[in-house]
Amino acid sequence: MKNSDKPAATTSDIHQEETPQVCSYEGSDYQEVFWDTGERRYEDAVEEVALKRLMPKHGKLLLELGAGAGRNTPRYAGWERIVLLDYSRTQLLQARERLGDSSRYVYVTADIYKLPFVSGLFDGATMIRTLHHLSDANTALTNVRRVLGEEAVFILEFANKRNLKAIARYLLGKQKWSPFTKEQVEFVALNYNFHPKTVRKLLKENQFLLKKQITVSHFRINVLKRRVKHELLVALDSLFQHTGSIIQLSPSVFTKSITSGRSSRSEDDAFFACPICDTSLPEARENQTCPGCGHVWAYEDGIYEFRINPES
């Protein structure tokens, strides 16, 4: 096709090109296969221990980034309201089925690189098993910081590039990439491992003050999970989590940070912000036409649709 024959790019097309590719779980049986079968019972249990240690017991408005089917949401029982955000609509439909239509929960499909909220809205945020899928971690964290208020808590989990298994494989010549270099490694398409120092640097550059880091899933080895009693393995991991303040050699690392610096906050009662033009929008449980750009944002099946180009 000649350039003159190409249709003009729409506003949505332009914004879509500006954002990095996302890893979508649309239509996936991830929750059922990965978690509900019990195969990852150990990982689920030790992550619960980590969250109990890091999360404030009480809070007002929490943003759960990469919420998926709501596996972790019940663990934030002390928070008054929780916004479950995921790129996959089908995952959020599962979350809604599990959690219900309580006014305590707000379900939002959106791109983490284009968060549809006014600045300084949230008192806290979690990002568990999500940074793992982000090619541009810096842009994502910049967006997260924008929507958080002053002294807000941020719980971030990341897949650790410098874990014992990766170190052993590298030293034995069974792995090409080095676990000691600072750049993130993409071992499968849109699946990334990060060096702990790189994550700490990104947090600092985006006005997050690191308060605590703990290591998780030290015994993520199939033979151990099969042969060692589940409760014992979880108890051992719980003990080893404290070593994260000294060194991080586990496959998963949890961090707790507090926002630093000033946070801008919308003067009106707006909740959402148009991902295309940033115009403030109310929290209305109905379709909304943005007064700034005219884009219609849908509300269907209890889910707010804020993906610029939603999947068919």
Feature map (PLM): residue ranges:
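A C-terminal cap/extension of S-adenosyl-L-methionine-dependent methyltransferases
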Residues: G173-K176, K201, K212-S280
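Short catalytic micro-motifs in class I SAM-dependent methyltransferases
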Residues: R129-H133
